């Protein structure tokens, strides 16, 4: 009887669904946060994106003053690590930007629009550096995107969130007028937008 009960309990335990991994976060700068948000929203396994500011010294930055405070435009990405790895997300950042440009991105110039990876822990820093080495080998030229430590994330104003979804025509004109897709496709060839499903 005990053996039967034990067998039943083991079977019940084995039939329990596996516990899903806790969502994780990443913070990436890739130029205009409208575009970065739109690209990462199209990555399977990404649960949420929020546009914002990070890396500067000023508190509570706004769109009017974030650059003066030393911040970049960034996107905080919430993701399911069972579906997409942090390393894969770093690869998406590289292949949706021009990480060889240290002066901005596309038509947006200046430090506030430069690329950066804010690693939130040592594991993320290691993965980001490894992906950077791979991407440099693939391009055959240096990538200037720095891997920096964690920085306080400040969400941008509501009107910046999901901008491409809420303002598709204005967004399309901005993205195409800025030359983002054209430049990324010229730089990366058939690897442009790898990992993005739109």
Swiss-Prot record:
Entry's Gene Ontology molecular function annotations: L-methionine:thioredoxin-disulfide S-oxidoreductase activity; peptide-methionine (S)-S-oxide reductase activity
Enzyme Commission code: 1.8.4.11
Active site per UniProt: 32
Keyword line: Oxidoreductase
Highest rank taxon of the organism: Bacteria
Catalytic reactions of this protein: L-methionyl-[protein] + [thioredoxin]-disulfide + H2O = L-methionyl-(S)-S-oxide-[protein] + [thioredoxin]-dithiol; [thioredoxin]-disulfide + L-methionine + H2O = L-methionine (S)-S-oxide + [thioredoxin]-dithiol
GO biological process: protein modification process
InterPro entries listed in its UniProt record: Met_Sox_Rdtase_MsrA_dom, Met_Sox_Rdtase_MsrA_sf
Gene3D superfamilies associated with the record: Peptide methionine sulphoxide reductase MsrA
Keyword Transit peptide: no
First-level EC class: oxidoreductase
Functional note: Has an important function as a repair enzyme for proteins that have been inactivated by oxidation. Catalyzes the reversible oxidation-reduction of methionine sulfoxide in proteins to methionine.
Family: Belongs to the MsrA Met sulfoxide reductase family.
Official protein name in the record: Peptide methionine sulfoxide reductase MsrA 2
């Amino acid at each position: 009887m005990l053996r039967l009960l034990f067998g039943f309990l083991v079977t019940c335990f084995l039939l329990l669904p596996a516990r899903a991994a806790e969502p994780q976060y990443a913070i990436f700068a890739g130029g205009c946060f409208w575009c970065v948000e739109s690209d990462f929203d199209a990555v399977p396994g990404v649960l949420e994106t929020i546009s914002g500011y990070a890396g500067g010294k000023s508190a509570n930055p706004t769109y009017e003053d974030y650059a003066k405070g030393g911040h970049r435009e960034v996107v905080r990405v919430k993701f399911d690590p069972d579906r997409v790895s942090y390393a894969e997300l770093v690869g998406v950042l590289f292949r949706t930007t021009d990480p060889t440009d240290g002066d901005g991105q596309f038509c947006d110039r200046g430090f506030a629009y430069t690329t950066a990876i804010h690693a939130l822990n040592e594991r993320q820093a290691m993965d980001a550096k490894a992906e950077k080495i791979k991407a440099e080998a693939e391009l055959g030229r240096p990538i200037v995107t720095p891997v920096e430590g964690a920085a306080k994330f400040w969400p941008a104003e509501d009107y910046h969130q999901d901008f491409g979804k809420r303002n598709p025509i204005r967004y399309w004109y901005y993205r195409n007028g800025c030359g983002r897709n054209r430049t990324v496709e010229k730089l990366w060839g058939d690897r442009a937008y790898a990992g993005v499903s739109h």
